Every structure is written in structure tokens, then in C-alpha cells.
Regions:
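Active-site-adjacent "subsite" loops/lids of carbohydrate-active enzymes
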Residues: 397-509, 595-596, 601-605
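Glycan-recognition surfaces
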Residues: 456-487, 544-614
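Beta-strand-rich binding/interaction modules
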Residues: 18-24, 28-52, 62, 74-78
Length: 614
């Protein structure tokens, strides 16, 4: 008997790996172990690889290294040795190679305006509009943002052991820089633990903090350990907190009032995230502020019933404490932790930005630009960029090539979706409208709809890279072959960046900017590819994939600068983030579309403090 139920695979083309998972725990006692093997076969039945599979309690998982497979369809067959009934399990995956794989578009070591080269002197790093002084924790001692100090005192690592408060012996701060980034190496020691930090500050002032917590010379029980960020209360009237996976209804507006503890993370829902962790917190005012963020709490030691983020006001100081440890533990091995810090504003606003008379158009759908799958598609039908060429001609001449459009409808739209007359009519209207619209744009900026958070599930690229790009660890790998209205949510990993940027280049080099719809943190559950991890209780803590989304948008913005010299038309990049305004991502945009939601179900206008915070 052959079946696929309870047998899952995930194929990762970029690393030539295959994950397999088989769960027969409902057929076996917990104290029993199944043994078997997994075979990878090509279309002719030739064996590519065979591995043993051990399944204690009826569950087993393996991660296989494969060769770089040629194009084709492959079978994955699992068979068991000691199951009462003879059963085999089978799945298939496809490998196709694409011209965009492994490209370096947008990966540049240049500094484009309005950013400025990163400079350092002593322990101080300067970026556009901001100056940071670093300390032995690899954190900020001072933050001068838009001419004002926003910290009330140095950021610190505070904690307590069974012997009392932690006492630190700090070492030197080693700073180096190049035009695009500065690096800080720092070390602080106590008897209970040692902290080694590598902090990288980039041109937009975003600092990636990679922190290692090591057992000290005299390990002790650590009761709590926190990153403490004291801010000047008079400069912090607003806040913005993100729940991973939510583009709307995130806490924003006026910062909580009062003295003492005014807020803690256990008070705010965090969606699929486990415990009380929230991935993004910004505190500030209309002109300046400071953001802390992380993909998740990997490497932390926490109690799900206690807050890991606490906001306390004492006199004129508002302190954000991030509890890396909030339950007793004695370190026995190195724990690695990654988070980010960024002060705002991240770059100067364009001159006379309030007087802009023309808002670039995008149409709200990519059907206007010859893309058949609405919203989630990235390229014209059949990857035929003659449609983009005709858009360029219509824009330059002010005339529409009616013959081309008629042939496009007949040879592309009616052929590809012939079985759906309603969609044929809809896509036909869209391409005529898009071509007519751009013929009147002239030198005004024009954007195309380029969905950020999802990919077309009918595309061959998705069929091959679905496990690498999707948010789930394993799926049924069964997707609708009908033209979808949207698509499957993606994570922004390197191979997806390569794919999207390759097609973005085709559009931008022809003078069309990007409208990136639905930009917000997601919940990536893949423990093989992301910061997601399996907790002690066996549950998976997802990753908000903020770092991946940051790299995606940075690459696209840098590519836009490279493409500007290739076209006479002005290029702009827009993100639609609604209520997901996170500094490390939206920095890399020229336009931000906000507030596509309703305050109190539309019964009241947005309060001024919400508009200021957003």
C-alpha cells in the first residue's frame, strides 16, 4: 500500500537539501521505535540517495544533502521495516533552474544619497542625522538624533544572581568602519557570565547586535538579565508596537502615562508568537525616537507567564527593559542572541516634500501591466517583457499601440485563461486601462503593483521554491492551479530576493517604480532556514523575518538607484504598510502608504497622536 498522509517533505533548492518528516505516532506505542529508509529517485527510477530513518514513538525526521539536481521530477519514497502492515509513503518534488538564481542585483557597496558615508572617531559613529557613542556592552552610551540627545543615560546590561546584582568588568571598545558600515567589538565580564558583542551599524543607522552570553569563571544562578534603555521622557510622547503577522491594529499613538510600570508585554497579544515576546517597539516623538526589534527570542531564557518587555517611568526617565533572562538559570553553554536598534529619523525628508503635487499611480492591481495573476504575479504573461517595452513607447509618444494590445489579448490572455471568460474580460480591461493611463504620465513617476508579501502559487518558480519561500515548515504541497486572486505568503529569504529583484530590474530599467503592497513582519516557522526554533516544550517559536524583509527592501532600493541611470523617467519605491511601520524596513522606501484600516470600526477619525506615531 502507498500513501502520503502523515508523510511530508520540504525541498530547498538553494542549499540542495531535502527535509522529510513521517508521523505514525497514532499507530504505535510511545515506547516503540520504528526503523526504515528514505529513497530519492529520479523520473527513470534511478536512485539518487538512500538514508536510514529512525522513528522513536513513531515520529521521525531527517535532513538530507543532495547533489545539484538536473531539471526534472523526483520521487521521495519512505518504507518501514517493522510496521505490522507493509506500507510505503511517497511524495514528489520538481527541480527547474532559472536564470535569476544567485544574482547579485542590489548587493552593492555604495552609499547613495540621501545617506552619507559612515564615519567613526574613538567610540563614536556618525551616520546621516545621527551620532552614536558605543560602550563595552556593544550598546549605545549616547544617541544624538536630529541634534538632540534622546537617552537619559547609557544603555546597559543589568541583572541579578543568587549572590546579588551583577558587577561588570568592562574591556575596550574596538571600532572600525568603512563607508557603508561600522563594526564594534566589545566585551564585558562578571563572575557569573561573560558577554561578547559584535555590533554592525549601517548607513541608515540600523545596528545589528550579535551577543554571546557565556558562562563566567564562577557560574551562578542568574535570576534575571535585561537590556536597559533609558530615554528622556520629555522626548517620548509616542510609541508603536508590532505584533508579528499583523499589518493592522497594532498598538500605536500616545505612550502609556503614569509613574512606575506603565506597560509590559504580557498586556499585549502577540499572535502566533509564544510567550510574551513582541518583535518591535518604537518610542519617540514626531521628530526623533528609537526602535528595538528582533526576529524572536531565540537564545533567551524566559517564563511564558512573565513579561519580557517592560516600560517603566520614573521621574523624567522612561526606561524600556528587554529581559533576555526572566527566570532562574545557571549558564552551562554559550547562548547567542540577535536584536536590532535604530534611531529615527533614518534619513532626511526630500526638499519641499509637503508640497508634492503628484502622487505616483499604481492602479491597485498588477493586471494593468500585463501580469495575469492578479496581485501576486511578478512578470508579464509568458515572462514576455515586450508589454513593458510598449508601456515605455506609449509613455514617450503619448500614443497607444492598439494592434499590439489586440494581439496581446488574443495570444496571451485568451490562451492562458481560456477557461474563464470573466477573467479574460477583466484582464483585457486592465491591460487597455494600464496602457492608456501611462500614455498620459509623461515624466511623472509611475509605479507598478509588485506584491511584497505573497507569490503566485500557479507559477513554476513557486512549484520549485515553495518550501524555501513559504512560511510553514511542511505543507501538503497541493496548490490550486486556477488563477488565484492572491497567493501564498512568503518570507523574503535570499532566493526569493533574487527572484523578485531579477524581475524588478526588468521593470525599473524601463522607468517603472515599485509599489510593494502589504509590507509587515510575518511568522516564518521553518527551523531549517530561519531563526525559528524548537522550544524546550517541543513547540516551534516562529521568526518575524524582519532581518530578511529589511535585506529585501534594501536590495530593491539600491537596485532602484542603479537603474535610475538607465532611464530618463524618475523612479520611486513605495511600501504599503498600513499600521506596520517598522524603521529597519520602511527606511528603504521613498513613499509609505499608511492607515488602510478604520479607527474604532470607522466610527471615529484617527486621533492626532496615532497619525503622528505612524
Amino acid at each position: 500500500m502507498s500513501e502520503s498522509q502523515n508523510f511530508f517533505i520540504a525541498y530547498y533548492p538553494s542549499s540542495n537539501r531535502l527535509a522529510v518528516f513521517l508521523d505514525l505516532s497514532d499507530r504505535l506505542a510511545r515506547d516503540k521505535t520504528l526503523k526504515g529508509q528514505v529513497k530519492i529517485l529520479d523520473a527513470a527510477g534511478k536512485e539518487i540517495k538512500t538514508v536510514k530513518l529512525t522513528m522513536p514513538g513513531g515520529k521521525g525526521e531527517a535532513l538530507l544533502d543532495l547533489p545539484d539536481l538536473p531539471d526534472g521530477t523526483y520521487k521521495v519514497v519512505a518504507s518501514l521495516e517493522n510496521l505490522a502492515e507493509k506500507t510505503s509513503f511517497q511524495r514528489e518534488f520538481v527541480r527547474l533552474h532559472f536564470p535569476w538564481e544567485g544574482n547579485t542585483l542590489g548587493l552593492c557597496d555604495k552609499v547613495y544619497p540621501p545617506f552619507q558615508p559612515v564615519k567613526h572617531s574613538g567610540k563614536t559613529v556618525e551616520v546621516v542625522l545621527r551620532r552614536y557613542t558605543l560602550n563595552a556592552f556593544g550598546l549605545w552610551e549616547n544617541v544624538i538624533s536630529a541634534g538632540k540627545e534622546i537617552l537619559q543615560g547609557p544603555m546597559e546590561i543589568k541583572g541579578e544572581t543568587s549572590q546579588g546584582p551583577l558587577k561588570w568588568k568592562t574591556g575596550t571598545v574596538n571600532l572600525t568602519s568603512r563607508p557603508t558600515a561600522a563594526q564594534c567589538l566589545a566585551r564585558a565580564e562578571s563572575e557569573a557570565l561573560v558577554i561578547e558583542t559584535r555590533s554592525l551599524i549601517e548607513v541608515d543607522g540600523c545596528m545589528r547586535v550579535e551577543m554571546a552570553l557565556l558562562p563566567g569563571r564562577k557560574p551562578q544562578e542568574i535570576r534575571w538579565l535585561a537590556v536597559s534603555i533609558p530615554l528622556k521622557d520629555e522626548l517620548v510622547s509616542l510609541w508603536h508596537v508590532m505584533q508579528s503577522g499583523s499589518i493592522r491594529h497594532n498598538p500605536t499613538g500616545a505612550v502609556p502615562s503614569g509613574q512606575g510600570v506603565v506597560w509590559e508585554s504580557s498586556q499585549t497579544g502577540n499572535g502566533p508568537m509564544l510567550g510574551t515576546f513582541l518583535p518591535y517597539i518604537w518610542l519617540g516623538g514626531p521628530e526623533r525616537g528609537l526602535a528595538w526589534f528582533a526576529n524572536n527570542d531565540r537564545g533567551w531564557v524566559t517564563d511564558d507567564n512573565r513579561s519580557v518587555q517592560v516600560l517603566t517611568r520614573k521621574g523624567r526617565t522612561l526606561t524600556l527593559d528587554i529581559y533576555l533572562i526572566n527566570r532562574p538559570v545557571t549558564l552551562s553553554a554559550t547562548r547567542k542572541i540577535v536584536f536590532g536598534l535604530q534611531a529615527s529619523p533614518t534619513k532626511p525628508m526630500p526638499k519641499n516634500w509637503r508640497l508634492a503635487e503628484d502622487i505616483p499611480m499604481h492602479g491597485g492591481s498588477n493586471g494593468y501591466w500585463g501580469i495575469i495573476p492578479h496581485f501576486a504575479g511578478k512578470y508579464p504573461a509568458d515572462r514576455d517583457y515586450t508589454f513593458a517595452d510598449e508601456l515605455l513607447i506609449a509613455r514617450k509618444t503619448g500614443r497607444v499601440n492598439q494592434k499590439f494590445l489586440k494581439e496581446w489579448v488574443e495570444n496571451k490572455i485568451k490562451r492562458i485563461i481560456a477557461d474563464n471568460p470573466e477573467q479574460v474580460e477583466d484582464r483585457t480591461r486592465h491591460v487597455y486601462s494600464g496602457m492608456n493611463s501611462i500614455s498620459h504620465r509623461g515624466k511623472k513617476p509611475q509605479l507598478i503593483y509588485f506584491e511584497e508579501h505573497a507569490q503566485d502559487i500557479t507559477s513554476p518558480e513557486w512549484e520549485v521554491f515553495q518550501d524555501e519561500w513559504g512560511l510553514k515548515q511542511y505543507t501538503e504541497r497541493a496548490w490550486s492551479r486556477q488563477q488565484p486572486g492572491t497567493g501564498a505568503a512568503i518570507n523574503g529569504c535570499r532566493s526569493y530576493q533574487d527572484f523578485a529583484l531579477w524581475h524588478a530590474f526588468q521593470w525599473m530599467s524601463r522607468g517603472l517604480g515599485m509599489y510593494c503592497d502589504n509590507t509587515y513582519p510575518r511568522n516564518w516557522e521553518n527551523v531549517h532556514l530561519s531563526d525559528a526554533y524548537v522550544r524546550e516544550d517541543g513547540q516551534v517559536q516562529p521568526s518575524a523575518c524582519i532581518w530578511e524583509l529589511r535585506e529585501y527592501h534594501r536590495r530593491m532600493w539600491c537596485l532602484q538607484q542603479d537603474c535610475q541611470v538607465l532611464t530618463e523617467f524618475p523612479l520611486l519605491k513605495s511600501v504599503h504598510m498600513t499600521n506596520g511601520n517598522i524603521l529597519p524596513v520602511v527606511t528603504w522606501a521613498d513613499i509609505s502608504l499608511d492607515n488602510e484600516w478604520a479607527w474604532k470600526n470607522g466610527e471615529e477619525p484617527f486621533p492626532p497622536e496615532v497619525l503622528l506615531a505612524e
